C-alpha cells in the first residue's frame, strides 16, 4: 500500500545518547544506509542529545529557529518533512531529562509549538519526556495539560519501558490530527530497555464520493428581473387584501411566489463533486481555457517561447483567482460579521473538509428516511410514556399538574394587536439571509429581494392569522435533516434532527414573540428564577448570581451543594393541553390561547436524506423544533417549577435547571435530607408534566474551600429516583466548567484548547482574507469565545490569565505575521487590542455599569446599593456604592465585591455617561492609554 510505504519512509529514530564523553560521535559512526541524520547534541556535557534518521527520498529541512537544547537540557529538534507532492508535515523530536523542570512544557515547548502552528501544517511531537502516562502523578498532569490545551492527542497507550520491577509509558507520540494516523503502537524488541514507538501516517486525502442535493439554482437569478416579473402578477397579490381566510391567502401567496421564482431560480438536482467556487467568473474561466490551450501548444512544440507565454497565462490566472477569492470572502464576512455561525460556514467552505464523510446507507434511502421519521416523531410521545413509567417504578404519586398553577387577574389579559408594514419590514431585514430554507425552498434572501412588492399582502396575512386565531396549515409542515452526533449513522438515535420551517412562518412567529414578551415583561409574569428568553438576562448574569452565592458561602465557612438537573427531550415531550392551560393562567386571552392551540396542533414532518423524502407523519407532543416561539413557550411551561421547591434554591435558563443550597458542615446530615426531599419534589413536578428527568445524568457538585471539603465524608451521596448520585470533581453548567474550588483551572484549560483549535483552522485559510477581514473573523470566532461569561471567571489565577494571554498573542501573530522573537506589544497596539487582563477588566466594568444603571436583572442590580440609600449623613463618599464586607479573599472574588470596587474607582465623568455605547467607547480609550 502507498500509505504504508509513505509511513515507512517517514520512520524517525531518536536517541538521547548519541554522544559519549566530551567527544561526540561522528555521523559516520552512527550512519544507516539510505537515511540522512539530523542531530541536536547536548554541548559541553557528557551524554544526551537527540537525532532523527530521515529517508533520503524525503525532503527534510531543520527549523533552526525552533531547534535547540535549553539551559535546563530540554531538547527540541524541529524538522519540516515533505514526501513527493504531498503536503508537508512538521515533526519535533524531543527529550526531557528526569531532572528538568516540568515547566519546560509551558515555557519552552509550548511557545515553539505555537510558532510552528503559524506554518499551517500538521505537527507530530515525539520523544522521551520522562512523564509516566500510566501513573496519575504530577508529571502526567503537566504533560496532559500541555497537549490538551494545544489540541494534541497522545496515541501511544502501552508501556514503553519495562524493567524487572516496573512498567512505564514515557516515550510518547503527540499528533495534531488523529486523521493522519493509520496505525500506531509499540514494537517489542530487546535492543534497549526503551521499546520503540511508531506511527504509520496517511498523507493523501481520501477521494470523496459524489453526493446529490436538490436546491434552487441561482446561477441566472437576477433580483431586479425577479421583482419586475413579480410586479406583473400584482393583481393576484392585491386580491389577498380582500380575503380573510389565512389558509387561502397563503396558498395564493405561495403560488404567485413559486411560479415566478421557478422561472428565475428553478429547482434542480445537482451532483456535487468538488467544493464550489462562486468567485470564479466567466472572465477567469476564459483565461483558464487560454492557459490550458497554451500548455497543450508547448507540449506539442517544446518551444521555449511557448513556455514563457504559458507561464504568463498561468500566473495571471493564479493572481485573478486569488484576488477574486479574497473579494468574495470579504463580502461574505462583511455581510455576516455579527453571526458567528455564518462566519464558520464561510471558513469551512474555504477549508477542505477532509474528515467529513458522505453518509452511505446499507438500506434503501427511502426506507431509512421512513425509519428515521418514525423514530423522530415518536421521541416526545415515548419520553412522556417513559416519564410515567419512571414515576410508577419509583412509587411517585402523581397528581393533577394544573391544580397549583397561579391564575392572574382577568382585567390584564393579553390580546394580539395588528402589526404594521413597518414592523414586519424591520423584522424581516433583521433576519439572517443565509439560513436554510424550509420545505418550499424559498430563503430569506428572496423574501428580502421582493419585499417592497409582497410587504402589504404579507402583513395582511399575518394580521389575519392573529385576528382569526388561525395558524396556516402549510406552515405546520417541517422538513427534517438528520445530523450525525456520533456512532453508527444508520441508527436513528445517533442523529440529531435539524428541523427546517418556512421562513415566512418565522416572521409571523417573531411578531407574536415581540408582542407576548412585552406583555409578560410589563406585568412581570415570568418567574425571577428563569433567566432564559428575557431581556437583560443571559447565561452570564445567571452564572454570576449562582457563583457569587457559592463564593459568599465559602466566605462564611459554608459549603454549597449544586445539583444540575438533566431533562431528556424536554422540548419534545411538552403536553399541549397543559401548556395551553398555563398560557391561559399566565394571562393570554381566550382568542390568544386559541391561536396558540392552532399553532401547536396539526403539525407534521418528513425526513429528507439527500434527495429522498419520507412520507409525512403527525407530531403529537412538544413545542416545534427550530421555531422562534419554542423557548418562550417552554419557559412558560416550567414557570411554576421554582415555586414548588421548599428548602433549596432553583434557577433555570430555559430547560437547564439547577438546585443549590449552602450549609454548614455540621448540618451535612440534615442538608442531605433536604436535598433529597427537594429532588423528589422536582422529580414529581417534572413527571407530572410529562418531562423525563434523568437521574443518571444529574450532576452533584460540592463547592467549598479545600479545608472544608476535606471534612466531608468520602461516602456522601444522594438517592434520587432509585439511583445513587455521588459528588463529581467537575461539572459543566451553561458553558462554564466548574470545579469544587471555583478555581476555573479546568475551564481555562478547555477554553485555551478550543480557542487554539479555532485559530489553527483560521490560520490554514488566512491567505483568503485581507488583514481587516482576518481581524474581524478572529475577533468574532475566537476572542468572543475566549470572553464568554468572563465576568464569572475573571477572578481566576494569574497563571490562567497568562494562558489566555498566550492565545491572544498567537491570534495577533496570525493576523500580523509577527515572528516568534519579535515583541508582541507593538502588534497588539497596532490591532487596537487590549491585553487580556485589561480586556477582562473592561468587561467587568461594563457589567458594573449595567448593574448600576438598571440594565441587568434585579438579582444583580439589587446588590449595587448607594451609601446614600443606607444613611442620610452627607459625606465625601455619599454617592459611592456601599462595599460589601467579606471576611476572606474568597469573598472578595465575588462579582458583587469586584463590581462595586471597580465602579467606585471610576472617574465621575465616566460614571455620569448615560449611553452604554458611549461609555464603552470612552472606557476603551482610557484602558488603551493605560496599556500602551
What does each model-identified segment do?
Residues 38-52, 133-140, 151-177, 239-243, ...:
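Active site of divalent-metal-dependent phosphoester/diester hydrolases
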Residues 112-123, 512-530, 553-555, 631-660:
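Active-site palm subdomain of RNA-directed nucleic acid polymerases
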Residues 1, 5-120, 133-137, 141-152, ...:
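Short phosphate/oxyanion-binding micro-motifs
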Residues 376, 410, 414-624, 661:
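Conserved pre-catalytic core of RNA-dependent polymerases
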Amino acid at each position: 500500500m502507498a500509505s504504508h510505504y509513505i509511513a515507512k519512509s517517514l520512520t524517525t529514530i531518536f536517541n538521547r545518547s548519541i554522544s559519549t564523553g566530551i567527544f561526540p560521535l561522528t555521523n559516520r559512526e552512527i550512519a544507516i544506509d539510505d537515511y540522512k541524520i539530523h542531530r541536536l547534541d547536548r554541548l559541553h556535557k557528557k551524554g544526551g542529545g537527540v537525532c532523527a534518521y530521515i529517508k533520503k527520498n524525503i525532503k527534510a529541512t531543520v527549523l533552526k529557529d525552533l531547534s535547540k537544547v535549553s539551559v535546563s537540557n530540554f531538547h527540541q529538534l524541529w524538522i519540516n518533512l515533505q514526501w513527493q507532492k504531498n503536503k508537508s508535515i512538521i515533526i519535533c523530536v524531543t527529550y526531557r531529562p528526569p531532572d528538568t523542570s516540568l515547566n519546560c512544557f509551558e515555557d519552552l515547548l509550548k511557545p515553539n509549538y505555537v510558532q510552528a502552528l503559524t506554518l499551517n501544517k500538521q505537527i507530530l511531537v515525539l520523544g522521551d519526556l520522562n512523564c509516566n502516562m500510566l501513573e496519575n502523578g504530577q508529571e502526567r498532569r503537566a504533560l496532559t495539560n500541555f497537549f490538551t490545551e494545544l489540541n494534541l492527542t497522545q496515541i501511544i497507550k502501552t508501556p514503553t519501558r519495562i524493567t524487572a520491577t516496573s512498567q512505564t509509558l514515557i516515550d510518547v507520540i503527540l499528533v495534531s490530527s488523529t486523521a493522519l494516523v493509520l496505525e500506531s503502537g509499540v514494537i517489542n524488541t530487546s535492543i534497549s530497555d526503551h521499546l520503540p514507538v511508531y506511527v504509520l501516517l496517511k498523507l493523501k486525502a481520501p477521494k470523496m464520493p459524489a453526493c446529490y442535493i436538490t436546491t434552487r439554482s441561482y446561477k441566472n437569478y437576477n433580483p431586479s428581473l425577479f421583482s419586475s416579473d413579480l410586479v406583473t402578477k400584482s393583481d393576484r397579490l392585491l386580491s389577498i387584501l380582500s380575503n380573510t381566510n389565512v389558509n387561502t391567502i397563503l396558498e395564493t401567496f405561495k403560488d404567485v411566489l413559486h411560479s415566478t421564482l421557478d422561472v428565475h431560480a428553478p429547482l434542480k438536482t445537482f451532483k456535487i463533486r468538488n467544493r464550489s467556487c462562486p468567485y470564479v467568473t466567466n472572465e477567469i474561466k476564459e483565461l483558464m481555457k487560454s492557459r490550458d490551450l497554451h500548455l497543450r501548444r508547448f507540449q506539442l512544440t517544446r518551444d521555449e517561447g511557448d513556455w514563457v507565454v504559458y507561464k504568463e497565462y498561468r500566473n495571471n490566472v493564479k493572481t485573478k483567482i486569488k484576488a477574486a477569492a479574497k473579494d468574495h470572502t470579504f463580502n461574505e464576512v462583511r455581510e455576516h460579521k455579527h453571526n458567528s455561525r455564518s462566519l464558520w460556514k464561510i471558513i469551512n467552505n474555504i477549508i477542505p473538509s477532509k474528515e467529513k464523510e458522505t453518509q452511505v446507507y446499507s438500506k434503501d434511502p427511502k426506507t431509512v428516511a421512513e425509519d428515521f421519521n418514525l423514530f423522530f416523531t415518536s421521541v416526545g410521545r415515548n419520553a412522556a410514556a417513559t416519564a410515567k413509567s419512571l414515576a410508577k417504578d419509583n412509587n411517585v404519586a402523581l397528581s393533577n399538574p394544573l391544580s397549583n398553577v397561579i391564575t392572574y387577574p382577568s382585567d390584564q389579559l393579553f390580546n394580539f394587536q395588528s402589526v404594521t408594514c413597518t414592523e414586519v419590514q424591520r423584522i424581516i431585514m433583521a433576519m439572517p439571509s443565509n439560513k436554510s430554507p424550509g420545505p418550499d425552498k424559498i430563503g430569506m434572501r428572496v423574501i428580502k429581494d421582493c419585499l417592497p412588492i409582497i410587504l402589504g399582502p404579507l402583513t395582511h396575512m399575518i394580521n389575519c392569522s392573529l385576528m382569526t386565531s388561525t395558524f396556516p396549515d402549510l406552515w405546520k409542515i417541517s422538513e427534517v435533516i438528520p445530523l450525525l452526533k456520533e456512532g453508527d449513522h444508520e441508527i436513528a438515535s445517533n442523529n440529531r434532527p435539524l428541523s427546517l420551517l418556512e421562513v415566512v412562518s418565522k416572521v409571523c412567529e417573531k411578531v407574536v414573540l415581540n408582542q407576548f414578551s412585552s406583555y409578560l415583561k410589563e406585568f412581570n409574569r415570568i418567574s425571577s428564577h428563569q433567566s432564559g428568553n428575557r431581556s437583560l438576562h443571559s447565561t452570564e448574569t445567571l452564572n454570576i448570581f449562582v457563583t457569587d452565592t457559592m463564593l459568599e458561602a465559602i466566605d462564611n465557612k459554608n459549603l454549597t451543594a449544586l445539583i444540575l438537573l438533566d431533562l431528556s427531550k424536554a422540548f419534545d415531550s411538552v403536553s399541549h393541553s397543559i401548556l395551553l392551560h398555563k398560557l391561559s393562567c399566565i394571562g393570554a386571552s381566550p382568542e390568544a390561547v386559541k391561536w396558540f392551540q392552532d399553532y401547536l396542533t396539526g403539525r407534521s414532518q418528513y425526513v429528507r436524506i439527500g434527495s429522498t423524502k419520507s412520507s409525512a407523519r403527525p407530531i403529537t407532543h412538544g413545542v416545534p423544533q427550530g421555531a422562534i416561539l419554542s423557548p418562550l413557550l417552554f419557559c412558560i411551561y416550567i414557570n411554576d417549577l421554582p415555586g414548588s421547591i421548599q428548602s433549596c434554591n432553583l434557577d433555570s435558563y430555559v430547560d437547564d435547571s439547577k438546585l443549590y443550597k449552602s450549609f454548614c458542615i455540621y448540618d451535612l446530615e440534615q442538608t442531605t435530607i433536604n436535598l433529597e426531599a427537594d429532588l423528589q419534589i422536582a422529580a414529581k413536578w417534572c413527571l407530572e408534566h410529562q418531562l423525563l428527568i434523568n437521574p443518571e445524568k444529574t450532576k452533584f457538585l460540592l463547592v467549598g474551600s479545600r479545608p472544608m471539603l476535606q471534612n466531608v465524608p468520602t461516602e456522601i451521596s444522594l438517592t434520587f429516583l432509585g439511583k445513587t448520585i455521588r459528588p463529581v470533581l467537575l461539572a459543566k453548567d451553561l458553558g462554564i466548567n466548574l470545579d469544587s474550588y471555583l478555581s476555573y483551572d479546568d475551564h481555562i484549560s478547555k477554553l485555551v484548547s478550543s480557542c487554539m483549535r479555532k485559530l489553527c483552522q483560521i490560520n490554514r485559510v488566512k491567505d483568503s482574507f485581507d488583514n481587516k477581514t482576518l481581524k474581524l473573523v478572529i475577533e468574532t470566532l475566537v476572542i468572543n469565545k475566549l470572553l464568554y461569561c468572563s465576568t464569572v471567571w475573571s477572578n481566576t489565577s494569574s497563571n490562567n490569565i497568562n494562558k489566555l494571554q498566550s492565545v491572544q498573542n498567537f491570534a495577533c501573530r496570525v493576523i500580523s505575521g509577527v515572528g516568534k522573537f519579535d515583541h508582541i506589544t507593538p502588534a497588539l497596539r497596532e490591532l487596537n487590542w487590549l491585553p487580556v487582563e485589561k480586556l477582562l477588566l473592561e468587561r467587568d466594568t461594563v457589567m458594573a455599569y449595567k448593574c448600576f444603571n438598571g440594565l441587568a436583572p434585579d438579582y444583580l442590580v439589587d446588590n449595587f446599593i448607594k451609601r446614600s440609600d443606607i444613611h442620610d449623613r452627607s459625606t465625601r463618599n455619599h454617592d459611592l456604592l456601599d462595599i460589601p464586607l467579606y471576611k476572606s479573599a474568597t469573598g472578595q472574588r465575588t462579582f458583587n465585591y469586584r463590581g462595586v470596587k471597580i465602579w467606585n474607582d471610576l472617574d465621575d465623568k465616566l460614571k455620569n455617561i448615560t449611553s452604554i455605547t458611549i461609555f464603552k467607547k470612552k472606557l476603551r480609550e482610557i484602558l488603551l492609554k493605560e496599556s500602551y
